[in-house]
Amino acid sequence: MKQPATMKWSASISFLLLLNFAEPRVLHTNEFGIESTLDSSQCPTEKNMFNVATIVVAQFVQDATKAEVNKMSSDALAAMKENTGDGCLENQLSVFLDEICHETELSNKYGFSGCCNQSGVERHQCLLARKKTAPDSVPPFHFPETAESCPAYEENRAMSINTFIYDVSKRNPFLYAPTILYLAAQYDKAVPACCKADNMEECFQTKRASMAKELREGSMLNEHVCAVIRKFGSRNLQAVLIIKLSQKFPKANITEIRKLALDVAHIHEQCCHGNAMECLQDGESVMTHMCSQQEILSSKTAECCKLPTIELGYCIIHAENGDKPEGLTLNPSEFLGDRNFAQFSSEEKLLFMASFLHEYSRNHPNLPVSVILKTAKSYQEILEKCSQSETPSKCQDNMEEELQKHIQESQALAKQSCNLYQKLGPYYLQNLFLIGYTRKAPQLTSAELIDLTGKMVSIASTCCQLSEEKRSACGEGLADIYIGHLCLRHEANPVNSGINHCCSSSYSNRRLCITSFLRDETYVPPPFSEDKFIFHKDLCQAQGRALQTMKQELLINLVKQKPEMTEEQHAAVTADFSGLLEKCCKDQDQEACFAKEGPKLISKTREALGV
């Protein structure tokens, strides 16, 4: 079954588009001494070095011009070669940061001299903290126009592609380097094909739309993963990866899964730290390892492993989950056996829970990550409690029922959301979400609330197309990303204590916490302002989405004035507003009609709502 596009990118949360470099230099182990598969001592190839350097510099110095980025990139590569003779350094990123800070004129010009006055980890963290998605100083990204693309590409293909990489990187500072190079490869295919097409403009339009979607979704996903790592740490990331890898490769044993989880976690961390070279090098190594271990991992990646490196990672990520081994079952109440959980050391408990995550995940390939994390937490709590009981086996009698509660809650939410989507349609479902989220976070602007709830509706439109068994994982995966971005918004500009609690307490419980958080009880509505409820004839000219947005802004302002507004009151106000539109838009002097009838509607609404 072909997955919808949005389903695909939500599934990618635990992987990368890993491609385009030779094998890495560093052998690393985790806290239990589990060895990495990243054990080669080879150095990076020359292939794409300048493009990768462009990514690093443009993402750290987003305001820099193309010429400035070119100079810093060239100087950094020259320094690497001068220091080693072959460009192979243990810490390549530090060379780039040295070069960025060496340009004192630029550090003063773009306001990061304070970071450059620091050293080591502090300097790195300071520069990372300056990264901003869509900063005001950088205009929005637009794919090159048709008239520009063909002559520029024909004149200098390499420069055309590098300019594309620069433009994407500076506007998407959290987008992983492999993803940027993958998009650049798509651009490299699209331009010559469209320049020769009979309908050039239509060809470019189609290609641009597809690439823009991948760019937008990839950037959001990568920023989300980096924020989760920063907030909840490496151990949380490894737990997520054990789940996803166990679902994808159910034949693999726990030792192989732990190694892969360690390596993929390391890659995510390097990508998030802006270390594009190691991100790429280690990425290819992991994909190469996966292809060499198909017998113990999955045969579903066989066709992927025939592809060029540039396409290999994308293909493996989106390949179907492997087939479950015959006879694979799990009885949680018997998994511990006759061992005493209370006598385990902290390290033994972590390893045991990793094994449980592995077994539970490969037995439940369609469950959401968050549900499995919550199930594992409940399982551990039951083991802790029952290990203190005089009759441990009897204490565990209701274990299966307790663990099922998390699955049932998620599936019930998916069913309820899909039923509402089918009953109300996207516009009225969004209005329902708008009322709910305005009550939760009235401090958000109308534009932010409309954007967030629009994304929530897109979850239903995407996931409700799937079979029932896949809806929950699809919905929870996308909700995790969108709620994650609400938490990023809170991090940048605090919303309220309720949102803070949900964003800070538990990664696996964020969605449920936000769902259960009904209203910000600390919110005090502002004094009523008629300026927010002035109507003009432009309402009559507005059509489609523009008219819907105007109505939704009115709805948001009403809820901010009266958070406890009932459904009946909302329906009455909506009917009155529709009546105003119908009356005044038919009037010969529309503006005069709105000036006369608008205040009457406002007075009636204020009286009905008691504001």
From Swiss-Prot:
Tissue spec. comment: Plasma.
A single BP term in Gene Ontology: response to tetrachloromethane
Function per UniProt: Binds estrogens, fatty acids and metals.
Posttranslational modification: Sulfated.
Name listed for the protein in its UniProt record: Alpha-fetoprotein
Extent of the signal sequence: 1-24
Cystine crosslinks: C101-C116, C115-C126, C150-C195, C194-C203, C226-C272, C271-C279, C291-C305, C304-C315, C386-C395, C418-C464, C463-C474, C487-C503, C502-C513, C540-C585, C584-C593
Keywords, alphabetical: Copper, Cytoplasm, Disulfide bond, Glycoprotein, Metal-binding, Phosphoprotein, Repeat, Secreted, Signal, Sulfation
SUPFAM superfamilies given in the database record: Serum albumin-like
Keyword Signal: yes
Domain Albumin: 25-212, 213-404, 405-603
